[in-house]
């Protein structure tokens, strides 16, 4: 993954030198001041004008930082899956994903998943769409929604 750093830096430089892109994204998709439940880059970009331009640069900064970490300490080892046998019980886990926090709760009965609940940032961010698009031109509405980086797979889960 660390080999991607030069290409990413070239992209960041190119985007920074594109005034048309900045003028198109700046001031578009500003989040409502009463927005709650934000997480991930959408929340962290809120202190950066909270618009589509700020969210783009927040994501680029986070990708750059992640590649810097990988370069400094190496790629992470993937966990080894183990056989849990026929165990039963409940569990919860939270993890920071590229789109924000995800929380998983599940129940096992005799080694089989009986119920689960997956709560992702996209499920919270989808609630912003109506506020971001109301009264906007179509192009601005599309930019606003696109800047939220919604995953259709997470929204419908």
Q: Where do the language-model regions lie?
A:
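Active-site bordering "gate/hinge" segments
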Residues: 1-157
């Amino acid at each position: 993954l660390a080999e991607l750093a030069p290409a990413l830096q070239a992209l960041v430089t190119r985007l920074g030198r594109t005034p048309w892109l900045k003028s198109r994204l700046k001031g578009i998709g500003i989040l409502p001041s009463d927005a709650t439940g934000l997480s991930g880059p959408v929340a962290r970009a809120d202190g950066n004008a909270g618009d589509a331009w700020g969210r783009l640069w927040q994501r680029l900064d986070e990708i750059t930082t992640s590649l810097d970490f990988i370069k400094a300490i190496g790629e992470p080892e993937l966990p080894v899956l183990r056989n849990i046998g026929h165990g039963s019980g409940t569990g919860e886990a939270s993890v920071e994903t590229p789109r924000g926090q995800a929380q998983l709760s599940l129940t096992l009965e005799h080694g089989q998943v009986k119920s689960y609940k997956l709560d992702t940032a996209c499920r919270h961010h989808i609630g912003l769409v109506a506020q971001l698009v109301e009264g906007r031109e179509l192009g601005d509405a599309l930019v606003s929604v696109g800047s939220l980086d919604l995953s259709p797979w997470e929204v419908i889960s």
